[in-house]
Amino acid sequence: MKIELAKKYGFCFGVKRAIKIAENTENSATIGELIHNNEEIDRLHKKFGVKTLNDISEITDEKRLIIRTHGITKDDLDVLKSKNKELIDATCPFVKKPQQIVEKMSSEGYDIVIFGDKNHPEVKGVKSYAKGKVFVVLDVSELKNLKISNKVALVSQTTKRIENFTKIAEFLMTTTKELRIFNTICNATFQNQEAAAKLAKKADVMIIIGGKNSSNTKQLLLISQNFCKNSYLIENENELKKEWFLNKEICGITAGASTPEWIIKKVVKKINTMC
C-alpha cells in the first residue's frame, strides 16, 4: 500500500509561533488550551512546565500567563492586564484581525454577523469586541429569523470552509442595503482543505491526524468524507486499526493546524508496520 501525504498539512504559522512562545516561557500557564492538541499540550507541560488553566478564575500564584492562540474575550483581557502578572500574548495574528474588524465596524454602526461556532473560544473572543448587535451563525437557515439591520459587516471564524462562508455572504446580499464582507478565513486553512480534498479524491483510505476538539481538523474530516468514505480522525498512532487498510492501495494522510510533525511521523511509521 502506498502512503501519500497531502501537499499542505499540519502546523500553521499561528501554532508554530505559539509553540515557540510557550517553549521560551518555561514554568508558565496558558489561559485555556494553547492549541487544540492534547499530545502537544502534554509535551509542553512535561518538558517546559507550561500548565493549562481553564479560565482566569483559576489564576493563583502564577507569575507568567500566556494567552492562547484562539485569543480570549475583551473583558478577560482587561482583567489580566489589571493583575500583577507578566502577560505573553500568543493570540494568532490572523485571529486578531476579525477582533479588530468587529470592534471597528460595530463602532461605526454596523450589525455584526460572525460565521462560526458560537461555543468556540475564537468566536467568543471575536464576539466580545462588538459594541452593538452581533449574531453568530453556522448556516443560512439561522439568518432567516434574525432581525438584522440594513447595515451589516460579515466576518468568519478563521478555520471555516470558504464555500459555506460564501453562502452566508450571498444570502446577506439579498437582504441588506449595505454589506461589508471581510474574508477572515486563514489562508493556511484554505490550502490545507484544498490539499485534503485533492488527495481524498484518489485515496482508498484517509487518515486525518489532530485533536478531536479542533475545528480545522474536524473540517478536514468532513471534506475527506465527501470524496473518500473510509476517512478516519485520530489523535495519535495508538488509535489506528489494521482493518482500515485491508485491500487498500492508497492511504492518504493529512493533519490539522495544531498537529506537530513528531505525531505525524509516528502515525506513518505505525501504518508501515501494519501493512
Curated annotation (Swiss-Prot):
GO biological process assignments: dimethylallyl diphosphate biosynthetic process; isopentenyl diphosphate biosynthetic process, methylerythritol 4-phosphate pathway; terpenoid biosynthetic process
InterPro entries per the UniProt record, alphabetical: LytB/IspH
Keywords: 4Fe-4S, Iron, Iron-sulfur, Isoprene biosynthesis, Metal-binding, Oxidoreductase
Cofactor(s) for this UniProt protein: [4Fe-4S] cluster
Keyword Transcription: no
Gene3D superfamilies assigned to the protein according to its UniProt record, in alphabetical order: 3.40.50.11270, 4-hydroxy-3-methylbut-2-enyl diphosphate reductase, catalytic domain
Domain of life of the source: Bacteria
Listed Pfam families: LYTB (PF02401)
UniProt pathway annotation: Isoprenoid biosynthesis; dimethylallyl diphosphate biosynthesis; dimethylallyl diphosphate from (2E)-4-hydroxy-3-methylbutenyl diphosphate: step 1/1; Isoprenoid biosynthesis; isopentenyl diphosphate biosynthesis via DXP pathway; isopentenyl diphosphate from 1-deoxy-D-xylulose 5-phosphate: step 6/6
GO molecular function (one): 4 iron, 4 sulfur cluster binding
Active site (catalytic residues): 122 (proton donor)
Binding site for dimethylallyl diphosphate: 36, 70, 120, 214-216, 258
UniProt: (2E)-4-hydroxy-3-methylbut-2-enyl diphosphate binding residues: 36, 70, 120, 158, 214-216, 258
E.C. designation(s): 1.17.7.4
List of residues binding [4Fe-4S] cluster: 12, 92, 186
Residues noted as binding isopentenyl diphosphate in the record, renumbered to the chain: 36, 70, 120, 214-216, 258
Recorded family membership: Belongs to the IspH family.
Function in brief: Catalyzes the conversion of 1-hydroxy-2-methyl-2-(E)-butenyl 4-diphosphate (HMBPP) into a mixture of isopentenyl diphosphate (IPP) and dimethylallyl diphosphate (DMAPP). Acts in the terminal step of the DOXP/MEP pathway for isoprenoid precursor biosynthesis.
Descriptive protein name: 4-hydroxy-3-methylbut-2-enyl diphosphate reductase
Species this protein is from: Campylobacter hominis (strain ATCC BAA-381 / DSM 21671 / CCUG 45161 / LMG 19568 / NCTC 13146 / CH001A)
